[in-house]
Amino acid sequence: MKKTAIALLAWFVSSASLAATPWQKITHPVPGAAQSIGSFANGCIIGADTLPVQSDNYQVMRTDQRRYFGHPDLVMFIQRLSHQAQQRGLGTVLIGDMGMPAGGRFNGGHASHQTGLDVDIFLQLPKTRWSQAQLLRPQALDLVSRDGKHVVPSRWSSDIASLIKLAAQDNDVTRIFVNPAIKQQLCLDAGSDRGWLRKVRPWFQHRAHMHVRLRCPADSLECEDQPLPPPGDGCGAELQSWFEPPKPGTTKPEKKTPPPLPPSCQALLDEHVL
């Protein structure tokens, strides 16, 4: 468990030690009507909103990294979700990375989060608000066992399941990425109300947080949506395949060269980065 905790901490701070990308040189949102451009893993945003860091319902972690920008739809989703969580007595929602002022590629830690439509939310719901020191150096709570096959019972709670369900039931949300073991536990706990599980997708890591993705806004004409998740609750063979050992000869995919930016994003960089 100690090694896992160290790995999680390294994941959350890794970006601080890497070389900056051109997008990090843009320190304020680009003026204009809100437009998410390109794909979640290759895009940018014009007219991003700033998530207010002061709220009774949520707290923003690592504000020194300045990753609390997003499309107005994302800001409203966070406010909506955290209000619902407070109404139900779940606790304070802890907000992690959203995007940079103009979106674009991070220097580490994320492949997506580029169009202002993604947010990481800790799977912790403290009843006592965190101090500024805790928020600047958050301690991730690993919910998954060392073998990756199930959640840790002492760390899992119905409140966490309720938070994920609330997010999945939001009409603007298209996908929520969690660790396969977390998805498995949600499948076990869901009962007969299972429609929302379709949006909850198993993915690597994501042992302590959920990654919520919104659909492209209707007026963002250059935004590229993903196909909808497959029909059904996703609790069958697809989920179980995540727990099977790798097939013989399986190797890690080679790191790909980033594709060219959408023309509108390249033009934005050319105009705002010297």
From Swiss-Prot:
Compartmental location: Periplasm
GO biological process: peptidoglycan metabolic process; proteolysis
Organism domain of life: Bacteria
InterPro entries attached to this UniProt entry: Hedgehog_sig/DD-Pept_Zn-bd_sf, Peptidase_M74
EC number annotated for this UniProt entry: 3.4.24.-
Assembly mode: Dimer.
Protein name: Penicillin-insensitive murein endopeptidase
Organism of provenance: Salmonella heidelberg (strain SL476)
Higher taxonomy: Bacteria, Pseudomonadati, Pseudomonadota, Gammaproteobacteria, Enterobacterales
